[in-house]
């Protein structure tokens, strides 16, 4: 009986940790302990520091396919105007999770930033049916 309770508690902890990042990703893995601090750096617009931290995380094989980490890395790159590398990493995130709303929104914003409105609008169309925050934000970004 003790083993069952312990196993159930471990399962609940895993599920709770898996979704702590607020992702819509179905390919979620438990994030490294440094990840929440890196997200805070991004929210504080400290993109260079975030890039350094995310690069350390991405050196570990188990995180190279995490769409949330890839998206945050691409976002930070885009904010430092490294558009080519940012696009590469958004596409990596989307190859893992084609419906990742954050990656879709942000790659759409990258297309606007790089004057490719046709691609931005095509990306917006992919978000159209979700009627989610990402759709509204990308639509607003396109219409600025």
Predicted regions located by residue number:
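Register position in tetratricopeptide repeats
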Residues: 43-44, 79, 113-114, 130, ...
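TPR/TPR-like (Sel1-like) alpha-helical repeat modules
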Residues: 105-134
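Structural marker of alpha-solenoid helical repeat scaffolds
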Residues: 60-62, 96, 127-130
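Residue-level recognition of tetratricopeptide repeat
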Residues: 64-66, 100, 132-135
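Canonical tetratricopeptide repeat
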Residues: 72, 106, 138-141
């Amino acid at each position: 009986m003790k083993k069952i309770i312990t196993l159930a508690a471990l399962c609940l902890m895993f599920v709770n940790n898996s979704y702590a990042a607020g992702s819509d990703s179905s390919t979620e893995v438990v994030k490294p302990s440094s990840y929440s601090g890196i997200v805070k750096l991004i929210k504080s617009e400290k993109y260079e520091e975030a890039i350094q931290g995310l690069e350390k995380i991405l050196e570990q094989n188990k995180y190279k396919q995490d769409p949330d980490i890839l998206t945050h890395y691409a976002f930070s790159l885009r904010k430092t105007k490294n558009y080519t590398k940012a696009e590469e990493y958004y596409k990596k995130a989307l190859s893992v999770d084609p419906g990742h709303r954050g990656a879709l929104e942000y790659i759409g914003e990258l297309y606007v930033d790089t004057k490719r409105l046709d691609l931005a609008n095509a990306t917006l169309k992919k978000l159209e049916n979700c009627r989610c925050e990402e759709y509204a934000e990308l639509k607003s970004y396109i219409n600025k």
